[in-house]
Amino acid sequence: MWFFGASVVLTSCKKDDDSDDTIIPPAETPGTVVVTSNITANTTWEAGTIYQLAGRITVTNGVTLTIEPGTIVKGEAGTGANATALLVARGGKLNANGTATAPIIFTSVADELDYADMAAGNFASPNLESTVNGLWGGVIILGKAPISASNDVGDVSEVQIEGIPTSDSNGLYGGNDAADNSGTIRYISIRHGGANIGSGNEINGLTLGGVGNGTIIENVEVVGNQDDGIEWFGGSVNVSN
């Protein structure tokens, strides 16, 4: 285990730098940037600023969100279909490359973790027990890799991911590109999340829908999640820890 003082709850259920990047500069330390709308241009979130998700925030098709090592992201409270989440739509990318000494933390606004804690090497929440859950949604990554799904008509190549209303077409996943690339994720911790919307309809700590094997996912920690830690819906991605 690479985080000290945090217990891990992890279950699963099989069901380049661009010159046009938008750089969000740090506010006064510790500083908070409230993210209220979808990410529609290449964007970098920098360590030293807390990024606060004010709802379901989508990295749209053709766009890359880069998160620097050691960055803190916090989700506002939300329940059911309105649960706060970071959603990477098909064709979007999340490059979140943390390290063992500078992990990227996704947690709740109720978590008092700050950059002073991180600088001291204290990565665990200073105020929330590791069993506290359901305070926000989670991270959802969707791709174009093959899936096994059907509806009333028969077999289909794309479906809506659970936890996202059908009115949001960014929730579609699946396709025929096994090598699809949704980015790189290393050394991230997802904490105190999960949302149960209905029977068989949840937001997990990390949801992977039709994610291709061009995507790299390594060393993911899920702490205190209401539903599954990581849940796969088809796809061909390999995940290692």
Predicted regions and their residues:
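Sec-dependent N-terminal signal peptides
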Residues: 1-7
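C-terminal motif of bacterial Sec signal peptides marking the signal peptidase cleavage site
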Residues: 9-12
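Beta-strand/loop edge motif enriched in small/polar residues
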Residues: 14-241
